[in-house]
Design a protein with these regions (language model features):
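C-terminal core of ALDH-fold dehydrogenases
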Residues: 306, 314-439
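N-terminal Rossmann-like NAD(P)+-binding subdomain of aldehyde/semialdehyde dehydrogenases
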Residues: 1-117
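Conserved NAD(P)+-binding/catalytic subdomain of aldehyde/semialdehyde dehydrogenases
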Residues: 172-259
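Conserved small-residue-rich beta-alpha loop and adjacent elements
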Residues: 102-166
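Short internal beta-strands
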Residues: 147-156, 260-267, 273
């Protein structure tokens, strides 16, 4: 495989060092929340957000006032985007069926899809108010039927952001708290004097929020590891450098540690894209962030063949993968490891982030190898059940169960089967033995 890097980002060792520092900070912060509750949350909010309201939880009157501050057009835009997310989530929900089957006479097996009973939705917004993240978590949880939805978002410029709060409320949040970072996800998962802990945390965030969710997993469920934004552009000479550069920088502006990768089989496109990035960084208002992100985490990878591009893409397993080639559907068919695909030059990651309807909370840091993104199914637990309705079935299944338990050395397990073989089948099975084999004529 001939793979050439025309530009590399930080070495993996340096990235791992950054992750290790984050882990230490998060661990200490979560311990403080567990020990000190609301007091720790208030101290952290004062330190990081310079925000100490009488109550972090918004009242209905405060929510109404914030929504009233938005224009009719702003509200219409929010409602349009939320409708697209709801429509797709509902279609996904409709595809998830409860089932019940009789696998043999008298044996009924089934499963039910039951909503998680309480969910904490984190909506990032300290640097940019992430209105769309409220649709992705809160509205999707509502479609799933979650009966208790808490939403948290940091203050923006020292106060609640009206658009984010409106999206949370319209999405169906039952409680809205203005707090961000580790303290928000920690309070929702651990609980405080004023916040009842949730069963599950969802939503994207910076490296500290993502690490906090990782450390809290087990105490609560999480949707997935959704850390700093990642984007990959897979392109050939059917598109130009301006388009590729725009798509790369459009995601690099998220934060200082947002990886952006161009994967191509065209040297000309690779070189043109590098020149276009230099040009665009001179006029991009968020260049102070995007330039650092591109310098430290940007990569341009040149391959000889489409098969090589596919192999490299699956190895990187990027969160967002923009495909602009003469064979977009081939990549859709062949790729196995990614967060979400954006197929064709008419499509772009920003549409997926904000309005098109698919969920933008997606796996990062190679998590796309083992999970997809947030969707309505993440809020549902599939629980199985079984029942035996006839004496014959209780006897037959019990006989096999008895012998298989004894094969593993579990006498107590076997007796659960044997007592039913005796009662419902009239067969004498001595205690501590497996059920006898029956001849075919029996």
């Amino acid at each position: 495989m001939a793979v050439e890097y025309l530009k590399r980002g930080k070495p993996d060792a340096e990235r791992a060092e950054d992750d290790a520092k984050t882990k230490v900070v998060v661990e200490a912060t979560l311990k403080g929340i567990e020990l000190r509750g609301d007091a720790a949350v208030r101290d952290l909010s004062a330190k990081f957000d310079n925000y100490t309201p009488a109550s972090f939880k918004l009242s209905q009157a405060e929510i109404d006032d914030l929504i009233a501050s938005l224009s009719d057009r702003e509200l219409a835009d929010i409602k349009f985007a939320q409708a697209q997310v709801r429509n797709f989530a509902q279609a996904q929900r409709d595809s998830m069926l409860d089932i019940e089957v009789e696998t043999m006479p008298g044996v009924i097996l089934g499963h039910k899809n039951i909503p998680v009973q309480s969910v904490g939705c984190y909506v990032p917004g300290g640097k940019f108010p992430m209105v769309a993240s409220a649709h992705m978590s809160v509205a999707t949880a509502t479609v799933a039927g979650v009966p208790r939805i808490i939403a948290c978002t940091p203050p923006f410029n020292g106060k609640p952001n009206a658009a984010v709060i409106a999206a949370m409320h319209l999405g169906g949040a039952h409680e809205i708290h203005v707090m961000g970072g580790i303290q928000a996800v920690g309070a929702m998962a651990i609980g405080t004097e004023t916040i009842e802990p949730v069963h599950m945390l969802v939503g994207p965030g910076n490296a500290f929020v993502a690490e906090a969710k990782r450390q809290l997993f087990g105490r609560v469920g999480i949707d997935l590891f959704a850390g700093p934004t990642e984007t990959m552009v897979i392109a050939d000479d059917t598109v130009d450098g301006e388009l590729c550069a725009t798509d790369l920088l459009g995601q690099a502006e998220h934060g200082y540690n947002s990886p952006s990768v161009l994967l191509t089989n065209s040297r000309k496109l690779a070189e043109d894209t590098l020149r276009e990035i230099d040009r665009l960084l001179k006029i991009l208002p968020t260049a102070d962030t995007a330039s650092i992100s591109w310098a430290d985490y940007g990569e341009v990878i040149l391959c000889d063949t489409y098969d090589e591009m596919l192999a490299v893409a699956d190895d990187i397993a990027s969160e967002h993968v923009q495909v602009m080639t003469d064979r977009d559907d081939w990549f859709l068919e062949k790729m196995t490891c990614y967060g979400a695909l954006f197929l064709g030059a008419r499509t772009n990651v920003s549409n997926g982030d904000k309005v098109i309807g698919t969920n933008h909370t997606l796996p990062t840091k190679k998590a796309g190898r083992y999970t997809g993104g947030l969707w309505v199914g993440k809020f549902l637990k599939t629980h199985s059940y079984q029942k035996i309705t006839t004496d014959d079935a209780a006897t037959l299944v019990g006989e096999y169960g008895s012998r298989l338990c004894m094969l593993e050395g579990f006498v107590g397990h076997a007796e659960q089967c044997n007592v039913r073989v005796r009662r419902y089948g009239g067969i004498n099975v001595p205690y501590g033995t497996g059920a006898p084999y029956r001849d075919a004529k029996d």
